């Protein structure tokens, strides 16, 4: 059996989860990564996506996050999300609003750097939409 470690998922509004887990899959800025007990220290930004956790009791749970940071140590993992909600509570209209806002930001981009960042963010949101709300 995998060794358990402490995991916390925090948004500005509240603490969404604080539990002993055996595995956390995080949408890191360079791609999805899995944190396990004893993981090498790592701090990374996270992109919009789904954080999946496997609790110490064997149950699994998932949360939708919209950016933030992940701090992984050998003893635990903390995800500080800009915004987060349980996957069962996600509002499809909220995702669509975020996509429309990202499209507007892309249209209003004043430099190539801003345009590139806006394109990446829009793509991440559309990928997330397809992941949690398949056609």
Curated annotation (Swiss-Prot):
Function, in words: Produces ATP from ADP in the presence of a proton gradient across the membrane.
GO molecular function annotation: ATP binding; proton-transporting ATP synthase activity, rotational mechanism
Swiss-Prot/TrEMBL keywords: ATP synthesis, Cell inner membrane, Cell membrane, CF(1), Hydrogen ion transport, Ion transport, Membrane, Transport
Gene Ontology, cellular component aspect: plasma membrane; proton-transporting ATP synthase complex
Protein name according to UniProt: ATP synthase epsilon chain
Main location: membrane
Any Pfam family hit: ATP-synt_DE_N
Subunit and partners: F-type ATPases have 2 components, CF(1) - the catalytic core - and CF(0) - the membrane proton channel. CF(1) has five subunits: alpha(3), beta(3), gamma(1), delta(1), epsilon(1). CF(0) has three main subunits: a, b and c.
Gene: atpC
Topology relative to the membrane: Peripheral membrane protein
Protein localization: Cell inner membrane
Family of the protein in this entry: Belongs to the ATPase epsilon chain family.
């Amino acid at each position: 059996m995998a060794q358990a470690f402490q995991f916390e998922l925090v948004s500005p509004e509240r603490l969404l989860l604080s539990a002993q887990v055996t595995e956390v899959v995080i949408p890191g800025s360079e791609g999805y990564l899995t944190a396990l007990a004893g993981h090498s220290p790592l701090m990374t930004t996270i992109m919009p996506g789904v954080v999946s956790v496997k609790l110490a009791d064997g149950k699994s749970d998932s949360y939708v996050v919209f950016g933030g940071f992940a701090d992984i140590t050998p003893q635990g993992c903390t995800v500080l999300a800009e915004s987060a909600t349980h996957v069962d509570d996600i509002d499809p209209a909220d995702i669509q609003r975020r996509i429309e806002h990202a499209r507007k930001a892309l249209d209003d981009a004043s430099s190539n750097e801003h345009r590139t960042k806006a394109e990446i963010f829009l793509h991440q949101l559309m990928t997330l939409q397809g992941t949690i709300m398949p056609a």
